[in-house]
């Protein structure tokens, strides 16, 4: 069965891979504490995505079905691919997370972790929840972190994904969201956007200090070799060294 293997039950990293060989190398470098993203944006249809995701799942024990740069248009494909494959994790917009939870429940996929994407406002304690296909085109819906977390729980999401963070730019906001998540029994937070080897430590530390039980930072382009397109296993090893130093 697919599952997220958190280091000391606290931290896993969500990363991309060029292909299955790269995914296996990364997973090994992370000592099993990595979740490998497969993006829905690359598939024209759900039917095209399902066999490919199954192929990855057969080789890697922890697969995350992604949107692709938080693209809200991918919410349906991501949810339905996940419902047909039951990966360890699926990424969702805030508004799409309930749909994904329903699709997974209907197919016996309750073990799949679902996140709900909220965005920074510039004000700690408030987030934007209008991250869906239509809502992202209209007036931004700013709500308190508490309202956002409680609504995620109502919809069946397990985690708050905070994107785009812009690296350290949104640290006070991340801390506010993480403390709120912890206070209301949400067990996972996923900081995303502009995370690199240089700021990974401070971002992870911020979440851990907030008291949220589990953290899964998404680290993408900063650890991908632009020449080969491969995520660098040596960078994964360095990320894990930071994790071990902080947990």
Curated annotation (Swiss-Prot):
<comment type="function">
    <text>Involved in the catabolism of D-glucosaminate. Catalyzes the conversion of keto-3-deoxygluconate 6-phosphate (KDGP) to yield pyruvate and glyceraldehyde-3-phosphate.</text>
</comment>
<keyword id="KW-0456">Lyase</keyword>
<dbReference type="InterPro" id="IPR010763">
    <property type="entry name" value="DgaF"/>
</dbReference>
<dbReference type="Pfam" id="PF07071">
    <property type="entry name" value="KDGP_aldolase"/>
</dbReference>
<dbReference type="GO" id="GO:0008675">
    <property type="term" value="F:2-dehydro-3-deoxy-phosphogluconate aldolase activity"/>
</dbReference>
<dbReference type="InterPro" id="IPR013785">
    <property type="entry name" value="Aldolase_TIM"/>
</dbReference>
<protein>
    <recommendedName>
        <fullName>2-dehydro-3-deoxy-phosphogluconate aldolase</fullName>
        <ecNumber>4.1.2.14</ecNumber>
    </recommendedName>
</protein>
<comment type="similarity">
    <text>Belongs to the DagF family.</text>
</comment>
